[in-house]
A protein has these predicted regions:
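A structural signal for short, well-ordered beta-strand segments and their strand-loop junctions
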Residues: 51, 116-119, 147-150, 216
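Active-site metal-binding loops of divalent metal-dependent hydrolases
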Residues: 12, 122, 153
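Conserved beta-strand scaffold positions in the cores of enzyme catalytic domains, especially
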Residues: 22, 76, 146-148
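Conserved core of the sugar-phosphate nucleotidyltransferase
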Residues: 126-215
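Conserved nucleotide-sugar donor-binding
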Residues: 211-225
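Conserved N-terminal catalytic core of the sugar/cofactor nucleotidyltransferase
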Residues: 1-7, 13, 27-117, 124-125, ...
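Conserved catalytic-core motifs of eukaryotic protein kinase domains, centered on the activation segment
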Residues: 18-19
Length: 227
């Protein structure tokens, strides 16, 4: 069974004040999402699921879904503020979208195979999809197997300013033991440093593994998260 690619696109408009992520940047108007999907399909993924908001459903279907639905199975699910687990209610003043796990849980009715989770507006590179697809295929038929594609910190910095990254720690067997978000990382005085809430600077290793929100799960994840 081929793994599924789950694309987190519900927060697109809220982060950029409009669907700028749907603007083309390639020679033929390709978006970052187009490159991600192309790399994923070449790596062996067999289905795409998008999570979006209903407010931009029409535009998203016209610009994105229409390019793929005749070539590969495509599903769309919706992340809305009022879609909450039993026992929870929406505060009337809430405007900000819920977090990543809430978005992932929106797909529990349509994903039944190992799957990858990516951000719609991040570029991950072909090799990342190849590595993750191989791992997900190996996880088929198993339970409680989850993984993350890590990136070398020095390769994820920006020349345009500071970045936020989830700095990871692993044990001797390469199992993820912690992720700490550092919200202001940049190269300063020739070394990579982050600034904490009190404006103190701390050095980070060039090769520190960081998360770019590229994950792999077996489908039992939905059940565990519900609990």
């Amino acid at each position: 069974m081929k793994p599924t690619l789950y694309v987190l696109a519900a927060g697109m408009g809220s982060r950029y004040g409009g669907l700028k992520q749907l603007d083309g940047l390639g020679p033929n108007g390709e978006t970052i999402m187009d490159y991600s999907i192309y790399d994923a399909l070449r790596a062996g993924f067999g289905k795409i699921v998008f999570v979006i908001r209903k407010t931009f459903d029409k535009e998203f279907r016209e610009k994105i879904i229409s390019k793929y639905e005749k070539h590969i199975p495509v599903e769309v699910v919706y992340q809305e503020l009022d879609n909450l687990p039993k026992g929870f209610t929406l505060h009337p003043d809430r405007q900000k979208p819920w977090g990543t796990n809430h978005a992932v849980m929106m797909a529990k009715e349509v994903i039944h195979e190992p799957f990858a989770v990516i951000n719609a507006d991040d570029f991950y590179g072909r090799e990342s999809y190849e590595i993750l697809a191989k791992q997900l295929i190996a996880m088929t038929g198993t339970e409680n197997h989850y993984c993350m594609v890590g990136y070398r910190l020095s390769n994820t910095l920006s020349e345009s300013g500071a970045v936020a990254r989830g700095v990871c720690e692993t044990d001797d067997n390469h199992f993820l033991s912690s992720i700490v978000e550092r919200t202001h990382i940049e190269r300063k005085d020739g070394v990579i440093q982050y600034k904490d809430a009190e404006n103190y600077w701390f050095e980070l290793p060039e090769n520190a593994p960081v998360s770019m929100n590229m994950w792999g799960f077996t489908p039992d994840y939905f059940e565990h998260s519900d609990k």
